[in-house]
């Protein structure tokens, strides 16, 4: 009960609620999704700016929502432990928006009938940020390769996966993490990183 109470105070908790609320709203009014997803320049010549943000909170299928929320709870809770709320929100929304912009541009050229939606880009952004800020330097490349192979491998089992969003989110997360470690690292982060390394060493 205490853990749930603590979790309810986090931004991750509120991001989960927003995703669920949007999914329920789309179930009630299916036409709403047409105003939330991103789509290419051929159909979106006016470039509706909100479509770079709303897809990050929009899911069409229940399995897509559940998979993303489980990942968000795990990664979000971990990354949020060593960032301020503002920093965490900047990483999550920043990488999510970058992934949607990349999807928007790519679909305009290569998949004119495709649409983009889902929190995956932002979640991969958190993953990239975590790899850069927490994982030991000598292990980063190996873990990055595993993540990339896994992302591509998912295509074999689940159709219509937005790999453009995944990779754009992942690599923007790596960049955000590098910037954080070089210019923004603070006492809260230092304390967490020290404690986390001790936890990892004790497990092995």
Model-inferred region functions:
Residues 1-204:
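A detector for small-residue-rich transmembrane helices and their helix-helix packing motifs
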């Amino acid at each position: 009960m205490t853990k749930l109470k603590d979790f309810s105070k986090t931004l991750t908790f509120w991001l989960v609620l927003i995703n669920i609320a949007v999914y329920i709203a789309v179930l009630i009014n299916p036409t709403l999704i047409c105003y939330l997803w991103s789509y290419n320049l051929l159909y979106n010549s006016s470039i509706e700016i909100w479509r770079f943000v709303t897809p990050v909170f929009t899911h069409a299928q229940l399995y897509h929502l559940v998979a993303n929320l489980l990942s968000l709870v795990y990664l979000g809770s971990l990354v949020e432990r060593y960032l301020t709320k503002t920093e965490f929100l900047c990483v999550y929304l920043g990488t999510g928006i970058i992934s949607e912009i990349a999807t928007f541009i790519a679909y305009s050229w290569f998949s004119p009938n495709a649409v983009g939606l889902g929190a995956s880009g932002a979640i991969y952004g958190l993953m990239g940020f975590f790899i850069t800020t927490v994982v030991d330097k000598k292990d980063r490349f190996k873990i990055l390769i595993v993540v990339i192979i896994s992302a591509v491998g998912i295509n074999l089992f689940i159709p219509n996966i937005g790999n453009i969003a995944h990779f754009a989110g992942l690599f923007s997360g790596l960049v955000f993490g590098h910037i954080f470690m070089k210019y923004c690292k603070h006492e809260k982060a230092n304390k967490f990183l020290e404690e986390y390394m001790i936890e990892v060493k004790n497990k092995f």
